[in-house]
Amino acid sequence: HKHQKVLHDDKHRYIAVVAGRRFGKSVFARHHCLLNALYEQGLYWIVNPTYRQGKQIHWHELKKEIPRELIGYKNEQELSIHLVNGSRIEIKGADNEDSLRGVGLKGVVVDEAADQKPRVWEEIIRPTLLDSQGWAVFIGTPKGFNWFYDLYLKGMKGSKTFDPEWKS
């Protein structure tokens, strides 16, 4: 829908999407990773608070949404899809922090960001984007004044913590 298109077209490095249920955040997350993976070869993640949650929300839908001719192969154990252009999209869980280390990412969607530990972003995921100058999108529903709210403020012009690399 039109709000998702605005998000897809945005060129900010970091985007915080705070939206209510049924906005289409999960669909946006999958499509955003796919569009970027088709445009620029690399590794893209969708990270949920838990591996199980990522599998339930994204894995089966992602397999259906990517046209067969774009898929090189799928790895059901690792929840990864290798595209014919060499890109890879993986579903991850922040509950297994060790599985998030030691790689370089082109882009990541942090899903249900308010339910994740800020340390996972700051100490584990963010460093994976440094070499490629990769992007990150944080999505979730509003859940009070927490680290996700703080990220949201970074993208709001006029806030004390505004950062021009961010959009909310």
Where are the regions a protein language model picked out?
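Phosphate/NTP-binding elements of NTP-utilizing enzymes
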Residues: H1-S168
